[in-house]
Regions:
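Protein-protein interaction scaffold domains that mediate dimerization/oligomerization
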Residues: 1-82, 90, 97, 211-212, ...
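A short beta-strand motif characteristic of beta-propeller blades
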Residues: 78-87, 123-135, 171-179, 215-223, ...
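Beta-rich, blade/repeat-based domains predominating
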Residues: 87-99, 133-147, 180-195, 224-239, ...
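Beta-propeller domains
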Residues: 106-130
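Conserved beta-strand positions in repeat-built beta-propeller and related beta-rich domains
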Residues: 106-110, 146-147, 154-158, 196-203, ...
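Structural signal for beta-propeller blades
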Residues: 112-115, 160-162, 204-206, 248-250, ...
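Short loop/turn segments that connect beta-strands within beta-propeller blades
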Residues: 118-122, 166-170, 210-214, 253-257, ...
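Blade-level signature of beta-propeller repeat domains, shared across WD40, Kelch, NHL, RCC1
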Residues: 314-371
Length: 371
């Protein structure tokens, strides 16, 4: 059978099936509603039958969510490879962040710098990671993020420090300012309230804190009892996500309370989860370094494998506002960009903004908002 004809038949069958469900449920509702409203009791319907129907409907709704998700998303749709701007001088890229205007921030293994790239992957700026002073010393950033005020922030594991880059400095090119000490900072992010999030790998903690305009730490909070926390990111509904070394991925709410782990909620078995992020529709995306995959965990439905091949050692992970998935492939020394949606990622409750949108303010273009 011709592939096009076969696909057309499958489409017709799917639409007819969904339509039949809609018609039958509408008809039943129209007939049952007045009977239940105007008569006492349930007629001959038993409690067991109601329970059975509820369970079947729950399963059907789950299946419909899966069908919808499988129509919306695409697998292994690689659209671009961005070479490591450091070349082969250092290790592969490991930390990655994408701002509102589409600018890409990258750290690489053993590289004393942060690269800032355009949407298309062209280098816009290089921030050398050097502490200026009597004895200028370089440091090696593990991961990178951007604060609400547009400042670049990094985790420096070797020096057990968190640093932000300030352009307002006595040095003409700006300077890195140490804002705090953490035993073993690994991943860094920003939560929905603008606080900086830092994973403390050996201590099994995530620290969150705010900064005032004098770079003083305020409103500190710590989440404990984690097992080798690696990457941290803003999560859906104002919470945050944390990946654990060779373990699970956990979602915390904005009160720093555990909501669930992805393993327990979705029944998913990770190998070694690394980069985590959430897209603008509230889906959670996770890179698995051991399995060399990227999975999407939707709000409703089963997990979907977005990338099942072509990754050697996926580490950092981020989503752009234009609906693309960016994966730092340390093993292949590049950033791999995937188009994982059939259409642009926008809806009535999740407005989509292109990095080329003229409606972006100058502050939005730099990812900048007040602290």
């Amino acid at each position: 059978m011709d592939y096009t004809l076969e696909a057309t038949h499958h489409k017709e069958k799917l639409l007819k099936t969904v339509y039949a469900l809609q018609v039958k449920s509408d008809t039943t509702l129209q007939k049952a509603s007045p009977l239940l409203s105007n008569h006492h009791g349930m007629g001959m319907v038993t409690e067991h039958q109601v329970h059975q129907l509820a369970e079947k409907v729950k399963g059907i709704c789950h299946d419909l969510d899966n069908i919808k998700n499988l129509l919306y998303y695409r697998q292994n749709n690689l659209v671009q490879q961005i070479p490591n701007p450091n070349g082969s001088s250092y290790g592969g890229p490991s930390g990655i962040h994408c701002s509102l205007d589409g600018s890409i921030y990258i750290t690489s293994e053993n590289a004393p710098c942060v690269h800032i790239l355009s949407c298309s992957g062209q280098t816009q700026q290089l921030l050398p990671c050097i502490e200026w002073g009597r004895e200028s010393e370089a440091f090696l950033p593990e991961d990178v993020t951007v604060t609400r005020s547009g400042m670049v922030a990094v985790a420096d594991m070797l020096n057990r420090a968190i640093c932000v880059f300030s352009h307002h400095s006595r040095f003409p090119k700006g300077e890195w300012i140490k804002i705090g000490k953490v035993n073993s900072p690994r991943g860094i992010g920003v939560d929905s309230s603008g606080k900086i999030l830092v994973t403390d790998y050996t201590q099994g903690k995530v620290h969150s804190f705010a900064l005032d305009h004098a770079f003083k730490i305020l409103s500190t909070h710590t989440v404990s009892n984690l097992c080798g926390p690696r990457y941290v990111s803003l999560g859906p509904d104002g919470g945050f996500l944390v990946s654990e070394e060779c373990g699970d991925v956990k979602l915390f709410n904005n009160q720093h309370k555990l909501v669930y782990s992805l393993g327990s909620k979705y029944g998913h078995q990770f190998g070694n989860p690394s980069g985590v992020c959430a897209d603008i529709e509230g889906n959670i995306l996770v890179a698995d370094e051991q399995h060399r995959t990227v999975h999407l965990f939707p709000k409703s439905g089963s997990p979907i494998c977005l990338v099942s091949e072509g990754l050697r050692k996926p580490t950092g992970l981020t989503c752009s506002t234009s609906g693309q998935l960016l994966v730092a492939d340390t093993g292949d020394n590049c950033i791999k960009v995937f188009k994982y949606r059939v259409r642009p990622a926008y809806s009535s409750d999740a407005p989509w903004v292109s990095c080329d949108s003229p409606n972006l303010t100058p502050r939005q273009r730099t990812g900048s908002m007040p602290l």
